[in-house]
Amino acid sequence: MKETMMETLSQRLNALQEKILEHYEQDSKLIYDQINYWKYVRLENAIFYAARERGMHTIDHQVVPPGTTSKAKAYQAIELQMALESLAQTDFNKEEWTLKDTSNEMWQTKPKQCFKKKGVTVEVWYDGNKDNSMHYVVWGAIYYKTHTDTWCKTEGYVDYWGIYYVHEQHKTYYEVFKQDAQMYGTSGKWEVHCNGNIIHCPDSMYSTSDDTVPTTELTAELQHTTPAHTAATTPCTKKTKSAPSCKCGVSRPSETDGVFVDLVTSKGCNKRRHQCCGDTTPIVHLKGDKNGLKCLRYRLRKFNSLYENISCTWHWIGGKGSKHTGILTVTYTTEAQRQKFLETVRIPPSVHVSVGYMTL
């Protein structure tokens, strides 16, 4: 009975993970495909949760996560799936929606429980010191839900006091610089650097003792516009003109449709293994979303003749590393084997490929 249950769960899990990996490979920009992705993730974690409840610790050589982990991920998937299904019922469904745009990391980034696109970095120097600075993001497009369950689209703006968007004629700040100034600074003053413009605090503004964000703004106008504020199907409350704000020019770096490949070699090394810094092994680092890498590693089993070893998913800690971005390391016996691997295996466009060497 237990073997039958194991086989059933294994078949369902394999089918779901195949669909998840196909989604990564397609690199779709349709909102309906992103809805399906989160449905697959929800079902995948439901299987893991059910397996753990039945005392299973592995399914077809895959480690079953703790029940609390699977439950939390399933809830995340449900939340994203429902939000996207709601958004898909509006005219915003005609826009491009990538896996990054609809990721849980983006959903939980400030302002939380909003979809966001086209981020631009703003640098704040506390005490006017560049070495004591923090980076924040102004979003060129913010999609939020009103109390009437209407999806609206607006833009992010920055002034001396923080970063905000306008909702029903009211500013909603999602970053307040004064709070961080109390934590990181000593003078209580700071400078906002955005697209080559600097926003300072005049003495008249600094003299206020109120902890709330003042209604009188100190802003620098980079573009002569007022915050855009549109609804998908029914109009939001019309916005009145306000003081000019700093809207950082929003642009996205161009992306190619293929896989990014970096060649990483040690200084002075030759491409041939027997000439490269002694006894080294050709490797490939596959960097991307952890869940996608897990599915990719599962699929790579059928190409096991094209590599020597493959690691579990890992990530850097500290520095510029991110716990949300995973890395798979694949080793090869020869450079020819590695080249055959890269020519044969289809790597999803969202996965960054780095080619290099390791001493093992």
UniProtKB/Swiss-Prot annotation:
Molecular function terms from GO: DNA binding; DNA-binding transcription factor activity; nucleotide binding
UniProt-listed GO biological process terms: DNA replication; DNA-templated transcription; regulation of DNA replication; viral DNA genome replication
Region (DNA-binding domain): 280-360
CC annotations in GO: host cell nucleus
Transactivation domain: region residues: 1-206
A Pfam entry, by short name: PPV_E2_N
Post-translational modification: Phosphorylated.
Domain of life: Viruses
Keywords carried by this UniProt record: Activator, DNA replication, DNA-binding, Early protein, Host nucleus, Isopeptide bond, Phosphoprotein, Repressor, Transcription, Transcription regulation, Ubl conjugation
Main location: host cell
Record's keyword annotation contains Phosphoprotein: yes
Chain positions of cross-link Glycyl lysine isopeptide (Lys-Gly) (interchain with G-Cter in SUMO): 287
Listed InterPro entries: E2/EBNA1_C_sf, Nucleotide-bd_a/b_plait_sf, Papillomavirus_E2_C, PPV_E2_N, Reg_prot_E2, Regulatory_protein_E2_N, Regulatory_protein_E2_N_1, Regulatory_protein_E2_N_2
Complex and partners: Binds DNA as homodimer. Interacts with protein E1; this interaction greatly increases E1 DNA-binding activity. Interacts with protein L1; this interaction enhances E2-dependent replication and transcription activation. Interacts with protein L2; this interaction inhibits E2 transcriptional activity but not DNA replication function E2. Interacts with protein E7; this interaction inhibits E7 oncogenic activity. Interacts with host TAF1; this interaction modulates E2-dependent transcriptional regulation. Interacts with host BRD4; this interaction mediates E2 transcriptional activation function.
HAMAP family: PPV_E2
Free-text function comment from the UniProt entry: Plays a role in the initiation of viral DNA replication. A dimer of E2 interacts with a dimer of E1 in order to improve specificity of E1 DNA binding activity. Once the complex recognizes and binds DNA at specific sites, the E2 dimer is removed from DNA. E2 also regulates viral transcription through binding to the E2RE response element (5'-ACCNNNNNNGGT-3') present in multiple copies in the regulatory regions of the viral genome. Activates or represses transcription depending on E2RE's position with regards to proximal promoter elements including the TATA-box.
Family as reported in the entry's similarity comment: Belongs to the papillomaviridae E2 protein family.
Entry protein name: Regulatory protein E2
Organism: Human papillomavirus type 70
